C-alpha cells in the first residue's frame, strides 16, 4: 500500500469511533457512497447500481436458489466487485461512513440468500474476482483467495502434483470463502476432518478497514473464523491451507438399492457400520423417490456412495468384512485418481474432463427452488422411523426431495469440540442433510410444509440439548432477527444449534472485534450488549 493510501486508512481508523453505530438511515446519500469509493481508492473500483445495464446479470450470476430471484426479493443498492484487496478495505470504510449494510458473497450458494439479500439499504460485496490460488508443494500448503471455487482449488492442486488433496465438499462451484469458514464437509472427512481443520493462516479485513493475518488478528479471531462463519467478523480475503496426502489411486462405487431390493434394511445396517469402518473408507448415502411407472407410481432409491483411498481389491475386502449385505463386487468399483473422483462426485459423470472443475457456469447442480435443513444423529434410527421417512418421500406432489447422510468416525472423532469454532465431533454417528426442490414458484408452500413436517417427525430421534444443525446448511426456521439486532437470548435459538458450547465464545470474540455489529445478518453472531 502506498504512503497516501496508508494515510487515508489511518485517518479512517482514527475517525471510525465517531461513525454511527446503527446502519442504513433512510436519508443516506448514495451518491456520496460512490464518491467515497473514488476518494479512498487509488484506482477504479467496479461498482454497479440499479441503473447499470449489467446490474441484474451480475446480481443473478451466482444465485443458486431461485426463491431469491423473485421480483419481490430486496435488491442491493450497489454491487461492488473488488479486483484487489484494497478495494475491499475501501468498501468496508465507505459502507460504514454512509450507513449501508454489507453482505459478503463468494460463491452464492447461501441456502437462505443471506449473502446477497437484506431488508435495509445494502451493498453486495461480490468477491468473484479475488480468485488467485498459489500452491506450494514443498510446503504442502496453498494460499487461496476467497472468491475461488472448490473446483478451481482442486484443479490447481492436482495441476502441481497428483498425490495431494484438500478435504472439502463435492459441488465444484461453491466458493471457498463461505465453505471453509462454515467448516466444509466432504468425502475425505473421516480421514482428515473438515476443511477448516486445515487452515493455518488467513487474511481478513476488519471493521476498521485493516488487513490482518493470523499473527495480527490474534488466536481468538483466528479460532472464530474457522467454522464460526467469517461474515460475522470481517471480510475473509484468503486462506492459507494445509494440503493432505492421497494415494495415486482411489476407488469409488455407487450402489443403488430400491425398497423392493431391501433398501430400508440396508440403510438400517449402515448406521452401525458407516462410522466404524477404516478411516480410508467413506460410505455415504442418498435417499430420494423415483417414478417407476407411467401412472406415476413411486419407490425409494437409496444410493450408497463410497470413496476408498486405495485400490479396488482392498476396498472389496473391506466391504466383505464390514458390510457384506451391500454386496459390493469388483465390477461396482472404479479406480481413478483423486482429482478424477472430484469430477465424478461433482457432476456425477465419469466422462467429463477435469476442466469442468474450472467451469463456474457448470449446470450441475442446476439452479432450482429449494429449502434445506440438517440434523446430527447420535443413536441408530429404528426401522420404523426409516419406514416413516420413506412414507413421507412417497407423498404425492413432492418428487425432488432428497436426504443425504454423511458418516462420522475416524478423524472427526479425534478432534475436540472446542479446537475450532465448528463443534460437531465425537458422539455423532452421521449428519443428515434434508433437501426439498421444486420447479414452479407456486409449489413453494407445499414443499416447505413437507420438509418442515419431516423435520418435526425426526425430533425425537436426533441430537438433543441442543438439537444440532450445520452452519453451511443454513436454516432460517431456527430463528432470526431483522437487521442483525439479536440479543444473546435471541441469537441462542440458532447459535446453540450451529455452535453448541462454542457460541458464547464466538459472541465474546464478536464483541471484541466488531462491538457495533457492522458485519451482521439475520443469523449472524451478535456482540454482547455494552
From Swiss-Prot:
Its cofactor is FAD. The FAD cofactor is bound via a bicovalent 6-S-cysteinyl, 8alpha-N1-histidyl FAD linkage. Glycans are attached at residues 51, 483. InterPro entries: BBE, FAD-bd_PCMH, FAD-bd_PCMH-like_sf, FAD-bd_PCMH_sub1, FAD-bd_PCMH_sub2, Oxid_FAD_bind_N. Residues 72-246 form the FAD-binding PCMH-type domain. Residues 1-24 form the signal peptide. Its EC number is 1.3.3.8. GO terms for molecular function: FAD binding; tetrahydroberberine oxidase activity. Binds 1 FAD per subunit in a bicovalent manner. Disulfide bonds join 36-94. The keyword Glycoprotein applies. Catalyzes the oxidation of different tetrahydroprotoberberines, such as (S)-canadine, (S)-scoulerine and (S)-corypalmine. Catalyzes the oxidation of (S)-coreximine and (S)-tetrahydropalmatine. Catalyzes the oxidation of different 1-benzylisoquinoline alkaloids, such as (S)-norreticuline, (S)-nororientaline, (S)-coclaurine and (S)-norisoorientaline. Exhibits strict specificity for the (S)-enantiomer of tetrahydroprotoberbirines and 1-benzylisoquinoline alkaloids. This is Tetrahydroberberine oxidase. It comes from Berberis wilsoniae.
